[in-house]
Amino acid sequence: DEVGRKHNDIDKDLNRAMHDSRMVYTCGDRSHADCLDDAQIAKMDLVCRKVGLRPGMKVLELGCGWGSFARYAAETYGAEVTGVTISKEQVELGCEICKGLPVEIRYQDYREVSGVYDRVISIGILEHVGYKNYRVYMKTVDRTLKDDGIAFFHTIGGNVSIVIGNPWTTRYIFPNGQIPSIAQLGK
């Protein structure tokens, strides 16, 4: 709850000013984009193509933010998406953004998710999880993913394994979080 309040439940108008029109919070794919909106659409489409998303597939998005990816996957690929976030503000706006689509945005901790999904998508949440919780996070993915399912992880990565985050980053950007290394995620 603390992370949700400090990091995500801030002024909606500020967030709208900082992000693209879909309120995508993570980096985009600028390889063929001329503006932020196009870069975010290109990133979301790349994720959908990489996981082979098809109509009717059930998708779990961990750390769904304002529902931007969930909306895109449902509108463009016909997926049925369940997104979870620990931000009440994100749930409220996400439900509004995804109204009328086969999307459910839940106020729920990733550790409490149940069900089985064709795809599990994780875009920009590992930075918030913290190294002490990587194993539990990966167990959640394993528990909720069908045997023939595909999981997708998009995160900022570090070259060095750290257990204490940068004080400035921890205070102003990722409360209780840190940048994961491949070694930490592989344990």
Predicted regions, residues:
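A short glycine-rich, Lys/Arg-flanked "PGG" loop and its adjoining helix->strand segment in the class I
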Residues: 135-147
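Conserved class I S-adenosyl-L-methionine
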Residues: 56-63
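Conserved beta-strand signature within the Rossmann-like core of class I S-adenosyl-L-methionine
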Residues: 148-156
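Substrate-binding/catalytic lobe of Class I Rossmann-like enzymes that use SAM or dcSAM, i.e.
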Residues: 157-187
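Conserved SAM-binding strand-loop segment of SAM-dependent methyltransferases
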Residues: 100-110
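A short acidic, Gly/Pro-enriched loop at the edge of an enzyme's catalytic core
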Residues: 111-120
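Conserved SAM-binding loop of SAM-dependent methyltransferases across substrates and taxa
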Residues: 66-77
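Conserved Class I S-adenosyl-L-methionine-dependent methyltransferase catalytic core
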Residues: 1-50, 54
